[in-house]
Amino acid sequence: MRSFISILFSIFFSNLIAQSITQNPLSYFGIGEQNFGSNAIYDALGRNSVNYYDSSQLNIFNPASYSSMSSGNTLLTIGLNGRLSKFSELNNDALRITIMPDQFALGFKLSKQIGAAFGLKPYSRRGYDITEYDSINLLINKYEGSGGTQAFFLGAGFRIFKLNTSNLSFGFNANYIFGSVTNTRNSKLFSTINSTPAGISNSTIKLNAINIDLGISFEQIISKNHSVILTGAFTPNLLSQNLKISEGLFYANSSSAGVIYDTINYNVVSSSINNSALKFGLSYRINLKSWQRNMRFINPSILFLGSYSTMKTNFSTSSNEMNQISFGIQFAPETKIFENNINLKLLEKINYRIGFYKQQNSINAISNLNYNDLGFTFGLGIPIIIQQSLSSFNASFSFGNCNAKNSSSLSEKYFGINFGFVFSPAKFDRWFRKRKLD
């Protein structure tokens, strides 16, 4: 098990530090493409990330959830996702495949009322490859974007109070953000046979920053079979930041030693970015009546989720605002898996998930760009019950269409797949257990 986890971590880390981990031309703007958080569990539920958690999973997007982890169980979560996109603009189409890491996080209980977690997750990413034929200036321009920023986080969740029917929790994540993104343009004349660019201009943004995520959760048990959870998460503007923009312009100078690029202009300036996010969520759980199947009883439940998220980014000459609504449903044929594991069939152990989301993305740069992203999702959660371990394998699939209001602008149709693993030691093999020696 531990060697398998090491292999997954190596795959995750190698993808995280890769130069290009997205293929979206809109990542040209700002510090790259950002989102509200990705995970195989939450993506399958229509991207509901702030309002779903239990003792068998680690929700790093709402740190208040850390207090709900079960005592004595350590949770390690790793995620990877892929995306097949078809971009269209006027009469031009292009297919792109992207593989991106989700997160690498470890969570554990410090006491009955306090849980903690730390890990690594993407913050922004840039990646595109566009060729332009300029017939007026007789130039071939190739635009490329690469790089990404990551966030290392350390957080804790506290149960403020717990009554017979009520539970209030609060949590925070402290994040250290680091990394860089680059825009590059290579230019050469139509008449040039040599593939070496005659001129190169690039702009690199390097960011080191600190910020904090705040989360809150209130659970109310209405009756034996009904409960509701209200959640919220807020990320204020960066508390501290060091942002540098390096811009250079170079031209090719041929010599006997080969092509040498001379610097025409190079400049480094300091800048700043404002980035904040807010999420609200609600979940409603209903424990259904027990079903009898072939002299066996199973205890099903259904969970309804809805959330609203907004993110605002202001940077240099561009700004971006994203708003998203999400809906999801999860059906669990059996809620008492550990107690009835021996009598359950495989399909009765799986959690079934479906969802829908709509995201509006407004980019104000050289011109105003307004995109609507609509998608449908579904997925499965398969518990790995070995000696009462909380481990599980989760998968989600999404179909979406991202269009601008202007029909001649760039559009995207995509299919996404997301895999996530939650690892937890078996009951007899605690990773952080105090041992006594006789």
Model-derived features: positions:
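Bacterial Sec-dependent N-terminal signal peptides
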Residues: 1-23, 118
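Subset of outer-membrane beta-barrel
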Residues: 19-438
